[in-house]
């Protein structure tokens, strides 16, 4: 196999990073010095690589829509210096030939460089950060600058951050800067402040009785050019606001086993592509209650949001994953099993009512339901509905359609799942799951109607001895809609302390063409993982089904692919 010329830069860089790290294999065990050094260096390397990706017409892998280069990679190198008074760091990123899912028609992810550089000056009562940084106010309703590499999300802020702690239990933060959007910083200027006060630090009796009460408030301001030309129709130009302000207030209470969080946010008129350039305000309200005691856990949550899509650039495509200032958390369970995650929920910025409830109980050992080793049971239910008008766009330049506060619209998503964890012997344990799901594909994907699914999952782990562990899982998704039934199986052998071998297969239909789904297809994969100290490398080969990768209500479409994949991680 001939390595593509474009791969030489990445290969040389990758090997250069590995060589210093690999020297530790031959060194003696490190002994902690009696006195820690004044300055420490730590960091990490993460490199996801696909070698010689193959065209596979049966599953639509690497057709003319995507880069079919013989070498693809997303590589990240983080370095950080730490000392008593000053910390500093940076990140190198290489996505000149990005992995599947990071190739779009605008080549937004394509490139390489050092997008993140920062220095932090710190004392006991304050710290100041200059450069790039991440931040979140409250639950993220009005500000969440964070990184999620699997989704291609990195909206770090380039500017300044100041945090002051005037006394125990109090913290005040202020920020100002521009957010990253792919490889650029051509966004509106944002500034803001956040304050939190933990009253148990001031009231001794509360602290002694395990009572905690925290109140907080936040403000964010976005500035954009008010003279930008955006037309409401062929004859009318929109009068755009120069400033958009958002506010957040929250209360968090905890007493022994009970906890509660209430939060409310509001945003001034912010016409943008997400809301079809209407001028109504945005709001979000949330209440979360939880209880945990002696094997019993309870959770109840409700959230209402309307017009809370908050971007630092108003006139970008609606499906663009960048430019977000805030993050609206999804009140749905993030599933890790393949078929349970086949139809993931995407938070709707236009508005939604979201409800979630969960109950967990541990049946004690040597009881009728607990058996010899005990049994864990968890029941979870999530329901997301639209607002009164089901997110029908209002006319540009107006205040849009009015929604009554309490009235719900159509069901967007619901998920009822029961999970059971059971140990049968000292060597064998199992995890079982049943899930009922309703997925409104018309709302969440643009077309397709409602998809109703029943999903069955069994997962067993057999600890053969101290060195060998065998795990197997079987999954089946039963539905009369969309692409029909799916099946999935996996077998995984762990050989402690270094190796893990796995083979898996998904069986289902290929992606639709001209509205018609293809024939049944096997999405097979085989992988070997090697762990040594702080190093992990995985080499695999197989097919990947086209679908959505989601975390916390944020999703990215990943096209079908086939080829050799290499994943390397090193922390030092």
Predicted segments with their positions:
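Bacterial N-terminal signal peptides
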Residues: 11-21
